[in-house]
């Protein structure tokens, strides 16, 4: 799976979910500036990790020092700094009252977020007839009626045969969205050509979250007609009053044959018996990069090591961001993605040679070089 931007809101309890209150309405696609900022953030994190590893190495080589530090830290857990206890009783009572008032604020904030989700669900139902009509045209179930056409739009004439619907509509959409397009392999394209619709619905009742549905025509790879991916929010809000992601679940893909499974590949190795000198071929299955890994989201284990936890956290951040991209960008703005309109068009048209990364710093200009440069500028 391709790595993506890691610039996400975090808390100890999860990742902040985008809602109608914090989702940028004009951010159709990930901009180059955002990606560069994420790259710089990742570089900073790598530098911090390097320093952390160095300190960890020193502590591992000095068990006495490590034991002393752990003892000091364990004695501080849950221990007050003593400041509150030093205040006058009347002041402590006022602080207690403020804590109670804050609980009232939290309850109102939770009610507000719930109402926002209810409002989003209400308007989601208004979108559904439009999205259903869009799907009919894309699939070729029916043709546009006169009222749906803009007769001022230029129609280019040619002698090409008239296909059914809009071929490879969703594959083109996904390719044109940077974060998702990076996940698609040439082998994935063979399946994604049969992708006929993508939908989302908010979860109902006491369960908070949303579900993505990917509808496929018959293909030579799996038997599923619909693949779903469901994102769940936590019941509690973040300190800033936002819903937090809890976990995601994806459908099991029913591959027609093991060799059709795009998420794994078979590696063959030759082994030689030391005693008999005979050789044999050993086949092992290893993970493979594929868009369809999206339906097998990473899961955090309680006994995960620190390094493993960091890697899983990055994958979780990317997975949640992908869900938001589908829900807030690809599905509601599918035609913009297909036509490469909006921010994405500007991003894709930038030549690599124009980017900052394409240039390297050279030595300071000599006086002769400066004269030549000044001459070229003046000309």
Curated annotation (Swiss-Prot):
One of its GO terms (cellular component) is cytoplasm. GO terms for biological process: nucleosome assembly. Residues 16-28 have a biased composition (Polar residues). Residues 1-30, 345-379 are annotated as: Disordered. Keywords: Nucleus. The keyword Heme does not apply. GO terms for molecular function: chromatin binding; H2A-H2B histone complex chaperone activity; histone binding. Pfam families: NAP. Belongs to the nucleosome assembly protein (NAP) family. This is Putative nucleosome assembly protein C2D10.11C.
